Design a protein with these regions (language model features):
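N-terminal pre-domains immediately preceding structured catalytic cores
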Residues: 17-116, 120-131, 136-154, 161-172, ...
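A conserved hydrophobic position in a structured secondary element of the catalytic/binding core
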Residues: 177
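Sec-dependent N-terminal signal peptides
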Residues: 4-13
Length: 324
């Protein structure tokens, strides 16, 4: 509730005098609950999100609880580190990098390719074989989307160069950078709040319109969910949709029909929203959307944890490809 009120106060400065008077009158007559109801309506208006993002730096996505972004280009053979401060991406350093000898996207174990996409860093390793330099950051490959695409392999790291000085022209699929820079990064970043975005060719900046469409879309989807509007809710799912456990769209529809038929009242709150572009070789615009979901249903079921979506945009509307 406090977050929502703060969220509304930030938006307050963009309201007309008449809208402010109306909000104050609603508060006077109905209290905080009335204000919440009014502010919730703004979340369902794309123009709100367009205005919200207008002055923010969103070239690598929209992040509420990420501090650093690694941006890699396989074509340019480089890796850049950006720090996110006050919704601006500040370049910390850019260095040449070595990628897998197979220039394509990674598909199977042992194909010597560096994966393309968006990946969290999951661990920091030290005391490795000298081949990997002083340390390595472990990426989340294969992520949820990769696994559902039947991609295999593991052990994709950002690591250093051999300590014996025998530098190679390519890696087995990892990203390798010079040891001094890697050691510097170890001191500067919190890997748990760092994401790696790897592009197959030139870096394509995320569009504000796409990000506004996604933010608007997930809140309309949420509203349909809260109000048991099955048709609207299901309209956000692509025909190619696959749930984390392999359930495809036809069975998912039937499952949700049974769930929505209970007509339970529920509350659903989203926070800590992170939206990253998800590059690919096929050129289709995809995004990874991750946030904290706080779900409470009348029947007693509760969930508070991470929701992960992979989405695309079709005809100006998000379509969910993968969900967990």
């Amino acid at each position: 509730m406090k977050k929502l009120i703060f969220f509304g106060l930030i938006f307050w400065m963009n309201l007309s005098a008449n809208e402010i008077y109306n909000l104050v009158d609603e508060y006077r007559k109905g209290g905080i609950s009335n204000i919440k109801s009014t502010l919730e309506k703004y979340l369902l208006d794309k123009s709100y999100w367009s205005n919200f993002l207008a002055k923010k730096d969103t070239k690598f996505g929209y992040f509420e609880n990420m501090d650093f972004v690694f941006v890699a280009s396989k074509k340019s053979q480089n890796l850049a580190l950006y720090k996110l401060e006050n919704q601006k991406f500040i370049l910390q350093n850019q260095t040449s990098a070595i990628f897998g000898s197979n220039g394509n996207d990674k598909m199977v174990e042992g194909d010597l390719a560096t994966p393309v996409g968006a990946y969290d860093l999951t661990a920091k390793l030290k005391n490795l074989d000298q081949y990997y330099g002083p340390l390595a950051f472990v990426t989340a490959y294969p992520n949820l989307y990769d696994r559902l695409q039947k991609k295999t392999g593991s052990g994709i790291w950002i690591h250093g160069l051999p300590l014996n000085g025998k530098r190679e022209k390519a890696t087995k699929g990892c990203i390798a950078i010079d040891n001094a820079t890697l050691t510097r990064y170890e001191k500067e970043i919190d890997y748990k709040k760092t994401i790696l975005i790897t592009y197959p060719s030139d870096i394509v900046e995320a569009s504000k319109d796409a990000l506004a469409t996604i933010l608007h879309g997930i809140f309309v989807w949420r509203d349909a969910w809260i109000n048991n509007d099955l048709d609207l809710y299901l309209s956000f799912y692509d025909e190619s949709f696959v749930r984390f456990d392999g359930m495809k769209i036809a069975h998912f529809r039937e499952y949700k029909k049974r769930v929505f038929a209970k007509d339970e009242s529920k509350s659903i709150d989203f926070s800590d929203i992170n939206i990253a572009p998800y590059p690919s070789e096929d050129g289709i615009e995809r995004y990874r959307v991750r946030f904290t979901e706080d779900y409470k249903a009348q029947g007693g079921y509760k969930f508070n944890g991470t929701k992960e979506l992979y989405v695309t945009i079709k005809a100006g509307k998000i379509k969910i490809l993968v969900e967990k």
